[in-house]
Amino acid sequence: MLSLDGIIVVWFFLLGTCIGSFLNVVVYRLPRGESLIRPASRCPSCNHPIRPWDNIPVLSWIILRGRCRDCGSNISGRYPISEAIMGFWFIGCSLLAFNAAPTTKISSWILTVFLALFGTALFASTQIVQAGSKVPRVLCWLLLFALAGTLFALFSIMST
């Protein structure tokens, strides 16, 4: 049986992998000026929409052995790796924040949110640059906002 702490760690990992999955969409579509919402994710080879049960972060890639269910073409290992990295990032953010401010839960949650947001924006920016595109301005503003929020949360924790 998992303890409450174990459940929280699993929850943060799952949340992080879902955010990581969405980041894969952001990295691909944002530099191209495409919508982040529509159309639904598709196989780049056969253009077939990805079924919801084939879009479960990390797990679906493992079950499908890194291939499209419809055409059998390879799906890059970058996708589940990005999802797992974000899952572990979210775990790290929560552990750091709750150990930094064990007595002030609201400050811990605020720090967790801003740390996770900063890491998410930084990871997406890094992936976009690695793909050879320019980082969109909205992502730069998100990075600055998340950094300011992280610093504010840290200073408020340190002053209590």
Spans of features found by a protein language model:
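A membrane-topology feature that recognizes alpha-helical transmembrane segments
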Residues: 1-160
